[in-house]
């Protein structure tokens, strides 16, 4: 079995950091990720820099990323202005977020969920015309920090609505880390049944220590792409206590011990997590860098 791990540390991982990370360090994070074998990377966010100052240098980051055959760079886009910026940097993919509840959608994107669907549809048409891969992410799919529970029926209805714009991929995001494996199975299997042939991707946070169990449940239910953040850094600046992306290195250890292939070197990602902690000035939440792999690597082994 093979699974794609999509690295989100350069975007979702860093966006919640208060101290601005230098552009050169962002580019180095991406370079190290590519060197470790990661081939899909969400590198930047083309949003209003006043709302997310950490992403103000998106164009500079994209100008410095290594252009390696087989490596695909994604940018988060909310509106036409963001898409204009993204297309000008030659991104390979765009990710457009549609939030599952009106309250969170207004706080996150200043629009209702219905308006978010309309925005996504318009952006998808433009991106398709430009030959750019299109992902739509349903945020707060497993629960909302303001409205509480979000029913599976409501999420699957939203899947049906966003699917009308023919995404290349549909992502289900546990934005505040409240999901559990049973709910994950229901939504992943339900999404796959509604849009057969469209890959299902999942984005989990480990806020309440369920992220890795949810990742396994997603794979069992048919998801083929998992987001993860080197070091386990990140969160949403517009959702209270939305901390703790699942850590790329810890997820890789789990997958590799289950004989699930990724094409990524966990030890290299773990070393990057340690380096990233030094850049940020505090140890990262990931555990592999502290405990090490198993069986322990022999000197000189790869």
Regions found by a protein language model. Give the residues of each.
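Catalytic cores and adjacent flexible loops of soluble metabolic enzymes
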Residues: 1-302
């Amino acid at each position: 079995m093979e699974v794609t791990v999509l690295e989100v540390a350069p975007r979702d991982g860093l966006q919640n950091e208060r101290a601005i990370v230098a552009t050169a360090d962002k580019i180095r994070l991406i370079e190290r990720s590519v060197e470790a074998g990661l081939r899909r990377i969400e590198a930047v966010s083309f949003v209003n820099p006043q709302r997310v100052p950490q992403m103000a240098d998106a164009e500079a980051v994209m100008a410095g990323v290594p252009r390696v055959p087989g490596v695909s760079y994604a940018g988060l886009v909310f509106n036409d202005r963001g898409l204009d910026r993204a297309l000008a940097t030659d991104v390979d993919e765009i990710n457009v977020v549609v939030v599952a509840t009106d309250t969170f959608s207004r706080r996150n994107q200043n629009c209702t969920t219905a308006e978010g669907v309309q925005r996504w549809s318009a952006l998808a048409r433009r991106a398709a015309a430009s030959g750019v891969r299109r992902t739509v992410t349903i945020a707060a799919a497993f629960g909302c920090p303001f409205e509480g529970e979000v029913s599976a029926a409501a999420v699957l209805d939203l899947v049906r609505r966003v699917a009308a714009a023919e995404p290349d991929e549909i992502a289900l995001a546990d934005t505040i880390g409240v999901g559990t494996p049973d709910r994950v199975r229901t939504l992943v299997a339900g999404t796959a049944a509604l849009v057969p042939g469209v890959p299902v991707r999942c984005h989990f946070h480990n806020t309440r220590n369920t992220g890795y169990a949810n990742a396994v449940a997603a794979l069992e239910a048919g998801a083929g792409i998992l987001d993860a953040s080197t070091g386990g850094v990140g969160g949403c600046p517009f959702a209270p206590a939305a901390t703790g992306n699942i850590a790329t290195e810890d997820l890789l250890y789990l997958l590799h011990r289950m004989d699930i292939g990724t094409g990524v070197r966990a030890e290299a990602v773990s070393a990057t997590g340690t380096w990233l902690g030094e850049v940020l000035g505090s140890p990262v939440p990931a555990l592999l860098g502290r405990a090490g792999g198993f069986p322990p690597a022999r000197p000189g082994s790869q």
